[in-house]
Every structure is written in C-alpha cells, then in structure tokens.
C-alpha cells in the first residue's frame, strides 16, 4: 500500500487579515475576541498609540517619518504617503499568503489613503485580495463622503473582490435610541462578520467543507460584491435567516444579477442537513439559474438554537452599481478632501468622550446581532483619545 509522504499532503491556505486604520484595527480586535482562528491578523496604522492597543499578531507602524506616530489627521493623502513609505514592511508581512483581506473604514485618513496601497502590494505578490470597506454615515459630513468615494474607488482597482458596507443602512437595523458611539462600534463589527463569514468557510471544520480553490473560483477578479447577514432561532430558523440574508438592508441592489454566490450557514450541533437544504433553496432561487453557487456549513458548539447565514454575491455587470454612485466613478481621479479640524469639532468630540466615560457599560455579546438591537461593549480606555486631539494637546504643551 503506497504511503503518503508529508510533502504530498496539501497544507491549509494561508489567510491574512489586514486592518488598516482605526476601523480596520477595531475589526481585527473584534475578530480576535470572537475567536476567529486559522488566520493571521495584521494591524497597520499611522497612529502609534492605536497600534499599542491592538490585539493583532503583527503590527506595522506606517509612515514613521511622515506622521511621527500621531495619525493621518483624517487626510487620505497623508495615509497614502505613509503606506508608500512603509511599502517594504507591508510586502514582508504579506509574503506567503494565499488570500488577504484588506479591511478599512472609508472616509478617514489612514484607511482611506493606505488601504489601496496595501492591496496593490498584495496583488503584486500574486495573492487573492478581498477588500471590505464601510461607507461613512451621512451625518459624518460631505468631506468624509468625498474621501470615502476616493478610497473605495482606488481600493476597488486593486482587489479581486470589493465588499462595500453602507453604514447608513445599518440605521435601519438598530434601535433609534442606540448611542452614537455604540453605533460606530456596530459598524466596525459588520466588517468582522464579513471577513469571518468568508474565512471560516476555509478554516473551520463543518458539515459541508470548502477549500481555498472553491472560494477563489467565486472571488477571483469578481469586482464589486454585496454581503448580507441573517440570524434566526426557533422554528423555521433556516428559512428566516436565509430570507434575512438575501433581503438584508446591507444589500443595495437585488442579488438576482449575481454571477457568483458564496454563502455560509453556521450553527450548533443541532443544525440539520434538512435546514441547510432549506436555506440553500431560498438563496439559489433568488439568483440566476446560471450563477456559480458555492456554500458551506460550519459547526460551532456554542451556538444553540440559532443559525447565522452570511451571503456574498459577486460578478455583477459593471452598470449594476451605477445608480448607487453619488458623485464619483471608478475612473475618476478626484482628490480626497483635505481634513479640517476646528475648535467646534474638538469640543463636540470631547463632549462625546466625556459622555462615554460616565455612561454605564454595555454587556458584550459574543456575536453582535444587528437584527435585534445589538449591544456592544463600551470601551472606557483613556488611550482611545483620537490622534488629532493628542496632537492638539501636545502642541499646547
């Protein structure tokens, strides 16, 4: 009987998750807290203090000379310059990966400016690159919207698949009384859910296992993608979760135009094959009969009487998202807006930080559920003071 040598056994795909900037770094911390395994976490930031508090496996301080460790000041051009300054460090950290996620919160400085540079380096190394970006809330202002359009446009050019999460649509899923700071944390956690839903298809043992080649078939050179998340328990939980996922407020257009669909069903040991079939039938009936559909089922012992379904739809026609674009197309080289931090802005943020320090802590849930008025752990760490406030304080001293 022939013996299989160690060199003949296929190794697991190397997956690296890169959080660029504040929101990307927060998403990494949430993934670590949620127990996501089988991937390497890399935090990249211009803010040295944020990196100090990061739970990432590897931390890269972008642009030491360009920023002196005090952040990009909400200016994407500073983030871009910082990433180019640290290009060799980025390359070294990404080498050897089969798949890289680049997560950013578009609209600020570091994530907006540095995100596409990180993706560009990964593509140069021949790595499958998936971008996951959040669009800012409308109330964050016109400058952040312009910065976000610029960032998402540039990131989209450098990744195989780009998943864009519109934060405004999160407002349809949470209680109106949810505090502002908690709302931002919920937005960060959706980044986590997107990355985790895809990576666990490869890294976690399940009832139905997929390998890297399956995921690559859907996500390689796929362009813009949509993500939906559904969560349900009790009777008909599979049907309810599947319907929530494909009708998710996070999905800006109908998924019936998708040429590729990847979805993951996650549940406890009480999850049955019949439930997986029910979910699959609902999702497949919502897309074209010619779509390439790949799905998996992941087992998590801690999940009792609950199913979570993550759907990624890819391969849309180029004009599918045209009506969703506000003022910037992919080919537009419009420069991002330069940041202006005035005394009123500082006063308002100081007020919000004071409120956060005096507020009662929220109970943390292992999985944030954006469908049931989620609660997110409040962070009372004084080290979370924004970088531009630290610069302002330093200048006064």
Cite the ranges covered by each PLM segment.
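Tubulin/FtsZ superfamily GTPase core signature
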Residues: 1-397
């Amino acid at each position: 009987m022939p013996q299989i040598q160690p060199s003949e056994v296929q190794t697991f795909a190397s997956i690296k998750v890169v959080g660029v900037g504040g929101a990307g770094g927060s998403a990494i911390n949430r993934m670590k807290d949620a127990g996501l395994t089988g991937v390497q976490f890399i935090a990249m930031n211009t803010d040295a203090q944020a990196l100090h508090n990061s739970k990432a496996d590897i931390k890269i301080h972008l642009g030491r000379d360009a920023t002196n460790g005090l952040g990009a000041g909400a200016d994407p051009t500073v983030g871009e310059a910082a990433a180019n300054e640290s290009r060799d460090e980025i390359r070294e950290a990404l080498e050897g990966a089969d798949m890289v996620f680049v997560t950013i919160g578009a609209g600020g400085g570091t994530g907006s400016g540095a995100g596409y540079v990180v993706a560009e380096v990964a593509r140069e190394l021949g790595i499958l690159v998936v971008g996951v970006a959040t669009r800012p809330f409308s109330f964050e202002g016109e400058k952040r919207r312009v910065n976000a359009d610029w960032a998402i446009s540039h990131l989209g050019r450098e990744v195989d698949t780009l998943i864009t999460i519109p934060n405004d649509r999160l407002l349809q899923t949470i209680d109106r009384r949810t505090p502002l700071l908690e709302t931002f944390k919920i937005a960060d956690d959706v980044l986590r859910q997107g990355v985790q839903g895809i990576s666990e298809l490869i890294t976690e043992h399940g009832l139905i296992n997929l390998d890297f080649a399956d995921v690559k078939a859907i996500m390689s050179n796929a362009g813009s993608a949509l993500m939906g998340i559904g969560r349900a328990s009790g009777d008909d939980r599979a049907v309810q979760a599947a319907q929530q996922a494909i009708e998710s407020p996070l999905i800006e257009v109908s998924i019936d135009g998708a040429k590729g669909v990847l979805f993951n069903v996650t549940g406890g040991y009480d999850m049955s094959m019949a439930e997986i079939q029910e979910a699959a039938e609902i999702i497949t009936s919502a897309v074209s009969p010619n779509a390439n559909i790949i799905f998996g089922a992941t087992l998590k012992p801690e999940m009792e009487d609950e199913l979570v379904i993550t759907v990624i739809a890819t391969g849309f026609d180029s004009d599918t998202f045209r009506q969703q674009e506000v003022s910037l197309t992919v080919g537009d080289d419009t420069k991002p807006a330069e940041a202006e931090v005035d005394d009123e802005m500082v006063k308002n943020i100081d007020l919000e930080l004071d409120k956060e320090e005096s507020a009662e802590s929220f109970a943390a849930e292992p999985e944030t559920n954006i469908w049931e008025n989620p609660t997110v752990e409040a962070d009372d760490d004084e080290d979370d003071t924004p970088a531009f406030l630290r610069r302002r304080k330093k200048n006064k001293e």
